[in-house]
A protein has these predicted regions:
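Short, small-residue-biased leader/transition segments that mark boundaries at the very start
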Residues: 1-13
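A short helix->beta-strand "capping" segment at the edge of beta-propeller domains
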Residues: 34-58, 320
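Beta-strand-rich domains and repeat architectures in extracellular enzymes and scaffolds
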Residues: 51-81, 284-295
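Structural signature of eukaryotic scaffold interfaces centered on beta-propeller domains
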Residues: 62-65, 111-116, 158-164, 208-222, ...
Length: 359
């Protein structure tokens, strides 16, 4: 599927691109049209400061979250453990957990995680179709699995989630709805919305549409904002769950472009966003904007295209563009601290992959 292929697998992308170099995206059809943003009122270039670690652990550091003087980094392709906890801001290794393997206590994959507190770290294993909750102790240098929530088979292969006080929010990957509310037993209890495409597409290609619209999501319980950014194209959705409003925005690159072949979606536009963080006032997102035909050209020249995004886009909670940061390093995951004006980011292109930016 598109999303599994795109995240962290340049070899898979290359094979797909070479195989689809002659196909084009879906044809525009009359339908709903959403607002566009084209520029940001403020732009600024910022430079990375490399964080020096006392241990070499990472193969593909994809996500990072800092909370309660602890930083947790998720490594998408680690041979041993998917998660690594450090003290913060000193970055001393505490413990690695989420052992990779096929055993009952092990994980087949790690798509993302949510760090709520030291005893509430939720991790999503799409291949096992389960969410596990972990607790870590800096004092004991330990991590223990507290519970496992097995997801209903009707959710197919969930690739992202947000945990709220009452349920999980999980995107729908069949294309019938936009996302599900899922109870803490793993059962879907309510479907919400539809994919906000501007194209008039046949119902039989909805699974391909859902693949193309694979989104990264975040939820802020303080303001009730759930936001999604697409991995392909340049589309943003903002659900205000307290006011029951839904905002859709397209950037200059528009919605995800794809070609449907036998019900499967093949990307033909750009790599879009790679992470999203919602604070009390703003929405931060990492943006790539690299065209697939440029990636294909790089592979055909025998070169490896850059992996990651060099932009952080900032929107207010209503979707108005506020700030565009241009980075001197390509990044994937971000953690935002507005009080200290600090961005912690992961970079898969560097041997020193944890970086800090000041905004």
């Amino acid at each position: 599927e598109i999303s599994a292929c795109l995240v962290g697998s340049e070899m898979c992308i290359r094979d797909r691109l070479i195989g689809i170099s002659a196909i084009i995206s879906c044809t525009d059809s009359p339908g709903t049209y959403y607002p566009r943003y084209s520029t940001f009122p403020n732009e600024k270039a910022i430079s990375a400061r490399v964080i020096e670690l006392d241990t070499a652990l990472f193969r593909y550091p994809f996500r990072v979250v800092v909370k309660d003087s602890i930083a947790i980094v998720m490594d998408l392709h680690n041979a041993d453990n998917y998660f690594h906890a450090f003290t913060y801001p000193n970055w001393k290794h505490i413990v690695s957990f989420g052992k990779r393997g096929e055993g009952p206590e092990e994980m087949l994959s790690a798509e993302t995680f949510q760090f709520n507190s030291l005893d509430s770290i939720y991790a999503l294993d799409a291949n096992k179709m389960q969410i596990s909750r972990w607790a870590i102790s800096a004092k004991d240098h330990s991590a223990t699995r507290q519970e496992v929530i097995r997801l209903d088979k009707n959710l197919i292969r969930s690739l992202d989630f947000c945990a709220t006080d009452s349920c999980f929010l999980i995107p729908d990957y069949l294309g019938e709805h936009r996302y599900w509310q899922v109870n803490y037993s793993g059962k879907p209890i309510r479907s919400i919305g539809k994919i906000p495409t501007e194209k008039d597409l046949a119902s039989e290609i909805r699974p391909a549409l859902a693949q193309a619209w694979r989104s990264f999501i975040d939820y802020n319980p303080h303001n009730g904002i759930l936001a999604m950014v697409t991995q392909l194209g340049e589309s943003i959705e903002i659900y205000n769950t307290k006011e029951n409003t839904h905002t859709v925005l397209y950037g200059p690159n528009g919605e995800p472009r794809f070609k449907s072949i036998k019900g499967e979606g093949f990307p033909t536009g750009i790599m879009g966003f790679s992470d999203i963080v919602i604070t009390d006032k703003y929405i931060y997102s990492v943006f790539q904007g690299i065209r697939f035909k440029d990636k294909l050209a790089s592979y055909q020249r025998g070169e490896k295209p850059e992996d990651g995004g060099r932009y952080i886009y900032v929107f207010d909670l209503k979707g108005n563009p506020i700030q565009k940061y241009t980075l001197d390093k390509p990044i994937y995951g971000i953690d935002i601290n507005e009080k200290t004006k600090t961005v912690i980011a992961t970079c898969v292109e560097s041997d020193e992959p944890i970086m800090e930016f000041k905004i």
